[in-house]
């Protein structure tokens, strides 16, 4: 209720009170004298009390517009607070998302760098191994060529001095001499010079490990060859016994070589 309406309401209230007091103070009209012959009862009129509006205390007036305005301001403030909190939370989430993307990209770059470093190290190692292998092959080929040249030179000198005697003796010895030469050639190829004067501590360890591995490999090959030789001897003996047994019981067999002698 506005101030103008309250003022109009207060002005109308005294007028209504004065009208009610005048009605109460008005004298009652004398009733006409009733005829003695016929007296009829008059209907009584109901007395309606005047409507008096409630009085508003004069100490403090209620301003509904001010209450509504304050409530609207409070709601607006709460809404603005919620909006600020929402945008602050959204900004924080966006910053966290950006930081997460940066961490992912940084980790991806680190992994790529590590992979590139490992690939480069592996390539260098493979190149070093290939170079070492090529160097060893070149040294072995050079050494074989030098040995062959020495052998040819020795044979040519011996042929010039002794003529065809060496060729005949070589033909008589046959496979045994050839096997011996093969053995000597293999030993000369495997017997490499041990140049360790220029090596450091780490290189000496690698060289010792290489020699140890080589010895283990030779022992393994030797064991395999011994087992193979033993198996071959066993098979030869079995076949020889079968041949001997067959020749003993064969009917009409002539002379044959059994047990290293003729019968």
UniProtKB/Swiss-Prot annotation:
Pfam families: Troponin (PF00992). Residues 44-56 have a biased composition (Pro residues). InterPro entries: TNNT (IPR027707), Troponin (IPR001978), Troponin_sf (IPR038077). GO terms for cellular component: troponin complex. Residues 1-38 have a biased composition (Acidic residues). Residues 1-64, 109-154 are annotated as: Disordered. The modification Phosphoserine is found at residue 2. Keywords: Muscle protein, Phosphoprotein. Expressed dominantly in slow muscles, like masseter, diaphragm, psoas major and spinnalis. Isoform 2 is also expressed in fast muscles. One of its GO terms (biological process) is regulation of muscle contraction. Residues 109-150 have a biased composition (Basic and acidic residues). The keyword Phosphoprotein applies. Troponin T is the tropomyosin-binding subunit of troponin, the thin filament regulatory complex which confers calcium-sensitivity to striated muscle actomyosin ATPase activity. Interacts with TPM3. Belongs to the troponin T family. This is Troponin T, slow skeletal muscle. It comes from Bos taurus. The lineage of its organism: Eukaryota, Metazoa, Chordata, Craniata, Vertebrata. The gene is TNNT1.
């Amino acid at each position: 209720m506005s101030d103008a309406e309250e003022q109009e309401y207060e002005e109308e209230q005294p007028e209504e009170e004065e009208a009610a007091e005048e009605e109460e103070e008005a004298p009652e009209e004398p009733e006409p004298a009733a005829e003695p012959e016929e007296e009829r009862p008059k209907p009584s009129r109901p007395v309606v009390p005047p409507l008096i509006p409630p009085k508003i205390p004069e100490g403090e007036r209620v301003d509904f517009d001010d209450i509504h305005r304050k409530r609207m301001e409070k709601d607006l403030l709460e809404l603005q607070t919620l909006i600020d909190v929402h945008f602050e939370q959204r900004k924080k989430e966006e910053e966290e998302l950006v930081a997460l993307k940066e961490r992912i990209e940084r980790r991806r770059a680190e992994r790529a760098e590590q992979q590139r470093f490992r690939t480069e190290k592996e390539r260098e190692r493979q190149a070093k191994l290939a170079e070492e292998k090529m160097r060893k092959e070149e040294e072995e080929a050079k050494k074989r060529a030098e040995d062959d040249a020495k052998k040819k030179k020795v044979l040519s000198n011996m042929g010039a001095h002794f003529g065809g005697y060496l060729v005949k003796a070589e033909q008589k010895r046959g496979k045994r001499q050839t096997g011996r030469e093969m053995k000597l050639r293999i030993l000369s190829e495997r017997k490499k010079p041990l140049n360790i004067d220029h090596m450091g501590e780490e290189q000496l360890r690698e060289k010792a490990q290489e020699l140890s591995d080589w010895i283990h490999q030779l022992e393994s090959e030797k064991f395999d060859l011994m087992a193979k030789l033993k198996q071959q001897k066993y098979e030869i003996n079995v076949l020889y016994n079968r041949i001997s047994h067959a020749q003993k019981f064969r009917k009409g067999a002539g002379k044959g070589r059994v047990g290293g002698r003729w019968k």
